[in-house]
Amino acid sequence: MASGSKKYEVKIRSVDTVIPVVLVQGHRLPQSNFDLLVPPGYSGIYFCFHKPTPRTCKDASVGFTTFPTMVAALKAALSKVLVIYYPLAGEFVTNSVGEAEILCNSRGVDLIEAYADVELRELNLYNPSVSVEAKLLPEKINGILSIQVTELRCGAMVVGCAFDHRATDAYSFFMFMSAWADISRNMPINQIPSYCRSLLSPRIISPSNSSDPIFDQIFTPLSFLPSVNPKTSLEYLVNHIYYISAADIARLQELSGHSHSKLVCFTAYCWKILARSACRVKALLDMKLSEVADEVEKWLSPATTEDHFLGLLDWVEAHRTKPILSTIFAADNKEEDKSVSCMVSSGRWFAEIDFGWGNAAFWSSHFPRRQKGGFLMPIPQPTTGDWIVYAQVAPSIVAAMEQEPTIFCPLRNLAVYESNSSRARL
């Protein structure tokens, strides 16, 4: 059987609930106006660690020589970090006007201990819906955060987390992970979270002049959405992970003009892919990459200002208490609507995670499949300059992304990620 294609079984060994060492009772944390834009739903993130060695454990405060001792260390550190990140140990409730709030009641975080009959090198990273979902990530989620720690046959470990996206985004969750790892290594925490919602308060402004018209296009109150036609068949998006070499990123920037950021150049490249997958927008197909990058910059610039985000806070305030959804994720029941949409995340890299037995060999986010929207999440690597890209897109876009010549290299297994012999593909 080819490496990266192995099917495997997972056995749950135990389920424990880890509570903070200092309890918080009855405190309610309201959602900010930005938080109210996020619909209920869980996101996942997982970290793969090689089997510990004396070299990788040299900075550990105790001997992480066995899986049980590592799990015990994770639990002990988790109970401490939840004192600082106490909302993650709570649960969502509804307030008197129907909006979600976090009840900080110290219910704790479920931690699952499991065993998987597979080696780390055999994991099919390219297709995480098969190799990761419901295997290395918690399948049943209680509260805001659930964690699964899985021992692999080779002695490697995967720490999988599933969390309610309304409570935390990728950046703040990485703050939590970094703090958890610091405590595990008896190191001081670098960043302390702030729960001061007044920093994100809307301006004193009347609803009639509180919003830029662009927000009415980007977001939609759920009550405005048409009812879904049950006879309409919408294809599910697929999850894939790709590798892009630093050489290809540099080549994109060269073709797009060095005045543009790498993220703008990457977005311009993706625009042309979307145009190709839709078999239309000929003007975009005929444009040079540098010209498309200029257009991306023109559209992006207004959305990177302080006024833009202040205006968004005002827009949400004017529409409270109506549930709101990003238009890109609003399923459409019009069979004739064949538009293609895609969004790109911030493209920032995050700190390496080390609980005391070495840095994670690989990590990625994971999201349940949906039927409309789609996005690309580029994750620049701090040491090599290479990118890992998590993609949740339609099958037609996958075909366009992988059509040669392309910068997207399917990440079939960990060997592709760890190899230093990658070559430029563009």
Region spans (language model):
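N-terminal low-complexity acidic/Ser/Pro-rich tracts
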Residues: 10, 14, 20-22
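Low-complexity, glycine/alanine/valine/leucine- and proline-rich hydrophobic stretches
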Residues: 330-417, 424
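Short, intrinsically disordered/low-complexity patches at protein termini
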Residues: 182, 192-194, 411-414, 422-424
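Soluble acyl-CoA-dependent acyltransferase catalytic core bearing the H(X)4D motif
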Residues: 2-5, 19-26, 39-40, 44-347
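Detector for long, low-complexity, acidic/polar
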Residues: 29-30, 34
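Short, surface-exposed beta-strand/loop micro-motifs that present aromatic residues
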Residues: 36, 144-150, 372-380
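Short, low-complexity polar/charged micro-motifs in intrinsically disordered terminal tails
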Residues: 100, 421-422
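PEST-like, low-complexity acidic/proline-rich intrinsically disordered segments
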Residues: 1-11, 401-402, 423
